[in-house]
């Protein structure tokens, strides 16, 4: 029963933090340590992220259907190849390549060295400041309809940084999008779509490690956490898309810096283990 209660809390944390630029993987590493539960493991973290990505699939189902259909048609009908949705399909595929290749190449490092709270606290602060600068200096004249192959590659490279817990997949992509001149809504929407292949792929790949490996929980608690993350994540998407139409990322920047600094202090004083 304790495992299920812990999984429920972790699913709630995942759902609340996955789409905000504050790093869900960092929260799933930091808060279990604060609660005395220990590290839930990279496999658990990757698998419950499937729940939030299913929320993306549901929320953007019309966009995804339109993009997928146009992309498939473009493979056989030349007249579709210049269509925005067909190009968007290619941009998402190309933008996913960096994180897939690096994720496979650095798997052992990601599951061990990258989970150090020293590193996570530092990346929360540094990438939080980067997000703040990007949001402050970035233009607001480009919409998602103006995305180019170059921009898709650059945002894909930025997303790959999120293999380090504390960076934040959405935070890295949003930062690059804002620096490239996209408005907040466009950068946010594209960040959600770009994450789908990588996150679902990583979650499926890690399914084999749920009953063993470094995972603290079995199938039951993991399924509970995944369902909770889906429900909460769906609500978080709707809220964030409304929020970014009128407000800046400043509150997220302040929160990241505060959490990162607190994490480093707690580790340095021995309150929690690195």
UniProtKB/Swiss-Prot annotation:
Cellular component aspect of the GO annotation: plasma membrane
Membrane-spanning residues: 40-60, 90-110, 114-134, 147-167, 190-210, 221-241, 252-272
Main location: membrane
Keyword RNA-binding: no
Pfam families xrefs: BacA
The reaction(s) this protein catalyses: di-trans,octa-cis-undecaprenyl diphosphate + H2O = di-trans,octa-cis-undecaprenyl phosphate + phosphate + H(+)
Keyword Hydrolase attached: yes
Top-level taxonomic group: Bacteria
Membrane topology: Multi-pass membrane protein
Similarity section: Belongs to the UppP family.
Other remarks on this protein: Bacitracin is thought to be involved in the inhibition of peptidoglycan synthesis by sequestering undecaprenyl diphosphate, thereby reducing the pool of lipid carrier available.
UniProt name for this protein: Undecaprenyl-diphosphatase
Origin organism lineage: Bacteria, Bacillati, Actinomycetota, Actinomycetes, Propionibacteriales
